[in-house]
Amino acid sequence: IDAGPGLGVALREDLPLPAAHLVAAIEGADALIVGTPVYQGGYAGLFKHVFDFVDPAKMAGMPVVLTATGGGLRHALVVEHSLRPLFGFFAAHMAPTSVYAGPDDMTDGRITDVLVAARLATAAVELAALLDVSRVIGAGAAA
């Protein structure tokens, strides 16, 4: 989803429609696979700014897989040290397996490293399980 220009506003009510739709899509999702490039040892500022507009109550219990890309292995822990605490704040249900890929792990934007591909497959299975649990809990709450 392209948020378009204008994402840099300070208040949610000032978001232009494309950005407001992005935030609404995040809040209404059954699950999220979130990813960010890593710059200077942290997630991208605009990535964080998008989540500054998200209502924490709408993310509570949402299944999430955490992913990131960066210039090398020295950025790999950003997923655990930055993304996991952010989504912990939202009380999201995060898959235990996260995925980080560097330039040596991809060719033309596709994962080519066997170990990274295996982590991706594991994270997908975990996300499916979290979705199943989320649906059972949701059905119980609706009854």
Regions found by a protein language model. Name each.
Residues 1-55, 118-121, 125, 129, ...:
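N-terminal beta1-alpha1-beta2 submodule of the flavodoxin-like/Rossmannoid cofactor-binding fold
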Residues 1-6, 99-106:
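Short connector loops at secondary-structure junctions
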Residues 15-18, 79, 112:
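Residue-level signature of the cytosolic catalytic core of signaling kinases
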Residues 42-43, 74-75, 108:
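Secondary-structure boundary/capping motif
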Residues 51, 84, 109-112:
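Juxtamembrane helix-loop transition sites at the ends of transmembrane segments
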Residues 56-60:
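Short, conserved loop/helix-junction motifs that constitute active-site signature segments
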Residues 64-103, 114-119:
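Short, glycine-/small-residue-rich phosphate/pyrophosphate-handling segment
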Residues 107-110, 122:
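Polytopic transmembrane helical bundles with strong interfacial aromatic enrichment
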